[in-house]
Amino acid sequence: MKKYLKTDEWNIIEDQFHPDRQRMSESIFSLGNGRFGQRGYFEEPYSSDSYRGSFVAGITFLDKTRVGWWKNGFPPYYTRIPKAADWSRINLRLIDEELDLAGWDVDSFNRRLDMKEGISYRDMEVTSPRGNQLRIHVEHITNMARPNLCLIKYSVSSINYTGRISLVPILDGNIVDDADLPNLKIWNILRSGSTSSCAYLWTQTRREDTQVCYAMTYQFFKNNKETTANPIRIEKEKQTGFSVGADVKPGDNVTLIKYTAIASSLYHERSELVEHSVAEAREAKSIGWNTLVEEHRRAWQEIWDETDVVIEGDPEAQQGIRYNIFQLYQTYRGDDPRLNIGPKGFTGEKYGGNTYWNTELCCVPFFLLSTPKEIAKNLLAYRYNQLPKAIENARKLGFKDGAALFPQVTNNGEECHSEWEITFEEIHRNNIIVYAIVQHAALTGNMDYIAKYGLEVMIAVSRFWRQRVSFSQPKQKYVILGVTGPDEYENNVDNNWYTNYSCIQCLKMTLRFLEMVAQQYPDEYAHIRRITNLDQVKESARWRDIIEHMYLPEDKERGIFIQNDGYMDKVLESTDNIPAEERPINQHWSWDRILRSCYIKQSDVLLGLYLYYFYFDTETVRRNFEFYEPMTVHESSLSPHIHSILAARIGKVEKAYQLFLHATRLDLDDYNNEADQGLHITSMPGSWLAIVRGFAGMQVLKETLCFSPVIPQKWDSYSFKVNYLKNTLHIRVRKEIEISLTAGSKVDIQVYGHPYTLERGTELKINMPMC
């Protein structure tokens, strides 16, 4: 772990300069608004170790697949989200000197990310090689209210310097990709230009013809008075901007406000990009900094009013949970079904910005429960819109009759992952998509989506499973061979329990909702039968046969489910036996050694017990938890929160708390020694779920919202809001549980198994057992 950031409930603070941790800090201080985002690199050039990266949502680049041994079914290309132009660049120049913290003395330094208001601040005092001392203050905003705008206020005060200070706002298209192909040239500059106060840079990806135009204007102040400053236009290869400045003496200050508008061909006609971005930049300047910042603050306040979690007595936990919520909303706005959430969001290029099954596991339930807005529905629509591609993906692997295999990794619906043990074998990903569809229905009460869209997906996935299973004559059971389960430290195994069990549940849900739609939505049912060529009697019989005869490996003596065939033949030992200097093992051990070990990357059997909790009693969960958790290294960000939830449910509250901190502060404390590459965005909602579904014990049982709260010893209280069936409940847990209905009319709930009816304006108070 790396603990160098200050603990504060609403702020992330780095109170001294850490050049050895610059890349990690750039990840931590990332900014975004769902349409674009940037790592938290310095606005001015920095010649030491740095990972500068800016990204625009929905912009992808197709890169040819490169593998040592080509296998039929491999995708021909890999999609990635490329670095975009650097729109935040501001150079600071003195006479014959230019600010570069790699070569200047940093006398004081404070960087602060205000999560409540969504503003990044940087304050520092620096001394140049020639002894010139300056005080610098920077405010940086990616506007949540106007999602095409970025705002930067860059202020410089002279401490002992007499002479000219020039500030140089630039749009920089001279970008080098930081992924595995640093020499890959992704962007063409179509045109750049400037007037006396506005510059633009019009760009296009080389292979997809996707276009982005950046436009920038500015205001310049000396001693808080605006001046025109006689700008010098800058036009270089792939760069455009201005140099503005003033003569200063000690005590004087200059300030530049940079207004940047970003427009992409995802939202605008190509022929209008320049005009639109220039107009929006100019409009921003006319509106002014103060008004734009206030709009931005209000937008964040609306988000926090819905989603904030308050933890009293534990500032580290409070900081962590707010940070995770903050970064998730910086990454995804939820207003465009063409977009999804990449594992790194706008904080890095790893994973190519692609969509994984993390979205359905963590993000969909978070948005379903935390906001009345239909954000989750757009994530489901993203998958529905890609159903034809999923059917095509399955066809490439030999499946037919409308069977669908959703990709492990995608930006456009086509598979673009080229590790065979993942692409071909981690097929459990299909089931979490069906699970998310059903969760949407269960938590919103809206069955229309299933009738119009969801059932079509469920049928296609169920057809895949009917063809993917094999019937074992010796076992007289259906088996699923050659798979990788959620634990990616086990490859090409047979009968992964989670895969087999989630297959059963997928088929059950399809059968259930087929009957529901047939009865309640006859027109939609007729449409689905027609477009899918469904033979319900014949196909349902096959699905039921698989459900009834699926092989599920178990150890009856231990009372546990076996992760997969052969797992129990391994040397079973605790992670305590791994030397600290060899963690994480994926950064120190050979792949052969990992595969032969018993160590589990992430929740596997336990993931099934979490998702399908209503089928398992507490003792079953306890036995499996106590067997598998000691062998789990949690080297996937998807793991700690699942274990935390289960630990809370079986009464291991302090263990749940330790795992919660792991999930909540995974990036802030760099548990896995990889925060420098970017944040773990799609697992961040897991920390929220660990509170709501773990400590608060929220479950839906027999269409009733149920709570069984516990509280970690360190906490005085915790509180949150949750949405269920168009109702919003506020829950506070301390020595007594307080539940009120803040939106809606009436809802039936259970607390510790006892039924209650909540009405608007009333509050339920219940003493916590044993307190």
How does the language model describe each region?
Residues D305-L339, P343, N500, Y525-G566:
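Gly/Pro-rich turn-and-neighbor structural signature
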Residues T347-T355, A404-K452, A460-D545:
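The feature captures the catalytic groove of carbohydrate-active enzymes
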Residues M1-Y351, W589-R593:
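Acidic/polar, glycine-enriched structural segments that form the non-catalytic walls/loops
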Residues T355-L361, P365-Y384, K508, R512-E515, ...:
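Active-site core of glycosidic bond-cleaving carbohydrate-active enzymes
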Residues R23-V56, T60, N358, C362, ...:
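C-terminal capping/lid segments that line or modulate ligand- or cofactor-binding pockets
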Residues I311-Q318, D335-D336, L369-L380, A441-E456, ...:
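Structural helix-adjacent loops and short alpha-helical linkers that scaffold large soluble proteins
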Residues P76-P129, L134-R135, T618, R622, ...:
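Non-catalytic C-terminal accessory modules of carbohydrate-active enzymes
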Residues Y332-T347, K373-Y435, A441, D448-K452, ...:
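Helix-terminus loop motifs that line ligand-binding clefts
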